[in-house]
């Protein structure tokens, strides 16, 4: 599992859903963060790179 803000987020879920496991991050916030970072909402957490 990946860790973000001290929270383990699931590898098999889409990143847009995985980010909602962080307290205070809902679906809309997750979408805004990904758009600002230029990351596709459809990518799986396990497929992310450190770039």
UniProtKB/Swiss-Prot annotation:
GO BP annotations, alphabetical order: translation
Matching SUPFAM superfamilies: S13-like H2TH domain
GO cellular component: ribonucleoprotein complex; ribosome
MF annotations from Gene Ontology: rRNA binding; structural constituent of ribosome; tRNA binding
Entry keyword Acyltransferase: no
Assembly behavior: Part of the 30S ribosomal subunit. Forms a loose heterodimer with protein S19. Forms two bridges to the 50S subunit in the 70S ribosome.
Family: Belongs to the universal ribosomal protein uS13 family.
UniProt name for this protein: Small ribosomal subunit protein uS13
Originating gene: rpsM
């Amino acid at each position: 599992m990946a860790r973000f803000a001290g929270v383990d987020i699931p590898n098999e879920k889409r990143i847009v859903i995985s980010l909602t496991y962080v307290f205070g991050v809902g679906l809309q916030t997750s979408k805004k963060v990904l758009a600002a970072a230029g990351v596709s909402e459809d990518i799986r957490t396990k497929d992310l790179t450190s770039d």
